Swiss-Prot record:
GO cellular component, one term: cytoplasm
Stated name of the protein: Transcriptional regulator MraZ
Leader peptide range in chain numbering: none
GO terms for MF: DNA-binding transcription factor activity; transcription cis-regulatory region binding
Species per Swiss-Prot/TrEMBL record: Xanthomonas oryzae pv. oryzae (strain KACC10331 / KXO85)
Organism phylogeny: Bacteria, Pseudomonadati, Pseudomonadota, Gammaproteobacteria, Lysobacterales
Length: 148
């Protein structure tokens, strides 16, 4: 399980170091490979999955009939735009320029461990996310019994 927030620096070639605390786990569960894709729900954010979890997500998304526009868009953003990334010998991932540019990641980014995946945010989008507050009206009935 991935959890926690880490400030990340992205070099001129689009490489980012995976935090040391996660490297062994990524190697163990995914053989040094992660799958990168767009977060279809929030701008400024990419998702990184271990391959096995990605296969489950991909298969689930692609099992839906693409006769509805929302399903096609989800399939395009998640599966059609995905890229398999491999940790190099220095524990870095090369984030494709197309993905970095689409979400506004330049030199600074934020990596969030979100249980079964990572979220990679542009620094600006992450700051905006953190500054948002939730009100009781934002929580659905299924969340009202959460003890935080």
């Amino acid at each position: 399980m991935f959890q926690g927030e880490t400030a990340i620096t992205v070099d001129d070639k689009g490489r980012m170091a995976v935090p040391t605390a996660y490297r062994d786990l990524v190697t163990r569960v995914s053989g040094n490979r992660l799958v990168l894709t767009y977060n279809p729900f929030e701008a400024g954010c990419l998702w990184l999955y271990a391959e096995k979890e990605w296969e489950r997500v991909r298969d689930d998304v692609m099992s839906k009939p693409n006769t509805q526009r929302v399903i096609r868009t989800l399939q395009q953003k998640l599966v059609g735009s995905s890229a398999v990334l491999e940790l190099d010998a220095n524990g870095r991932l090369s984030i494709p320029a197309s993905h970095r540019n689409a979400v506004g990641i330049e030199k600074k980014a934020v990596l969030l461990g979100m249980g079964d995946k990572f979220e990679l945010w542009s620094e600006q989008a992450h700051r905006a996310l953190i500054q948002q507050t939730l009100s009781d009206g934002d929580l659905g009935d299924e969340l009202l019994d959460l003890r935080l």
